């Protein structure tokens, strides 16, 4: 059956992918790095949250879990995540092998591993912390999400789902606490260690589903009787996101990378990402109506995979062309907008020729 779409969720995805691209446009050592890194890692949090909210969600029913056959899940993961990962990974490795040395000499002299062979092995291993994914680091998200969906799939099919659900929501806190105390950082295939860290966000998305069901009209920009109450909740969530950023700034956090092993203050990691992600969901309701801006944001939200796998190329090209630019949020925002527009243009062309590169079927080549 066709997957049900809600305007608010598409808008949230559109805002989140813009924040991710904005974070990649920024200089990691620039004056606004905390704000930009915060936008990137909360943007990633939104995708894990919404992945949980829409997991096995189909038209006509809104089940807690619909007992989807594993074969169906495996086919979906292959088509929508694994195949695009290997296609764009191979393209990225080839381009990096040809142009990587030049780009690194201008932007990152400390980068190495330009040979195609080792990078292909790095693609098979699929961990951005290995040093062999410099060709397109954002692709780590695809294989990490494969682990997350598989873990939750088997967890939700268990007869002891409540106890296992509790374990999945608490295990990452124990995992990261031990990791920070021992200073032992694992680098597992397909970002398994990161997948364990983000289990609570996927689980929180499962809890969000019931809210989406009861407030479906709001997610689609419709006026309903409890509008005042819902607006109050959304304002509270947006305020919580602002407080999360303020908390980071007050504590002097310098590195807000999504991967918890590179986040300098663990006490900020979980609450800031969760509050920031819910804040983005709150703001996205402003774009769930039928106005032109809302339509554009939702159009982008329906094509986030294309932007994720391709934005590395225009971002690096603009960084090379503007390598002597003055660092500012406005400059980074301009680079982000140009990168997103270029990705959408290429997506429109490639989707007509070979929609499989973006995990789509031919009959639904317009949306993910």
Language-model features, listed with the residues they occupy:
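Alpha-helical transmembrane segments and their immediate juxtamembrane cytosolic regions
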Residues: 2-368
């Amino acid at each position: 059956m066709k997957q049900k779409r809600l305007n608010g969720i598409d808008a949230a995805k559109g805002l989140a992918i813009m924040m991710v691209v904005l974070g990649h446009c920024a200089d990691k050592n620039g004056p606004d790095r905390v704000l930009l890194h915060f936008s990137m890692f909360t943007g990633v949090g939104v995708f894990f949250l919404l992945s949980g909210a829409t997991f096995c969600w189909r038209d006509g029913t809104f089940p807690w879990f619909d007992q989807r056959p594993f074969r169906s899940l495996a086919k979906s993961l292959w088509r929508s995540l694994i195949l695009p990962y290997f296609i764009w990974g191979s393209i990225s490795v080839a381009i990096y092998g040809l142009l990587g040395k030049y780009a690194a000499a201008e932007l990152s002299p400390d980068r190495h591993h330009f040979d195609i062979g080792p990078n292909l092995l790095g693609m098979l291993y699929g961990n951005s912390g290995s040093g062999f994914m410099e060709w397109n680091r954002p692709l780590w998200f695809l294989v990490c999400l494969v682990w997350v969906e598989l873990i939750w799939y088997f967890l939700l099919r268990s007869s002891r789902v409540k106890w296992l659900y509790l374990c999945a929501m608490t295990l990452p806190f124990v995992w990261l606490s031990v990791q920070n105390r021992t200073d032992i950082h694992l680098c597992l295939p397909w970002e398994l260690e990161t997948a364990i860290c983000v289990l609570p966000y996927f689980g929180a998305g499962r809890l969000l589903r019931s809210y989406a069901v009861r407030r479906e009209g709001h997610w689609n920009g419709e006026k309903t009787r409890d509008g005042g109450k819902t607006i109050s909740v959304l304002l509270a969530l947006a305020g919580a996101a602002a407080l999360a950023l303020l908390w980071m700034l007050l504590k002097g956090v310098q590195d807000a990378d999504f991967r918890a092993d590179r986040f300098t203050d663990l006490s900020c990691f979980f609450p800031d990402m969760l509050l920031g992600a819910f804040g983005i969901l709150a703001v996205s309701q402003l774009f769930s109506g039928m106005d032109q801006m809302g339509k554009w944001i939702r159009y982008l939200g329906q094509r986030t995979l294309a932007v994720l796998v391709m934005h590395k190329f225009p971002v690096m090209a603009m960084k090379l062309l503007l390598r002597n630019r003055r660092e500012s949020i406005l400059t980074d925002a301009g680079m982000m907008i140009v990168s997103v527009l270029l990705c959408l243009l290429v997506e429109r062309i490639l989707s007509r020729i070979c929609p499989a590169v973006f995990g789509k079927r031919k009959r639904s080549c317009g949306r993910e």
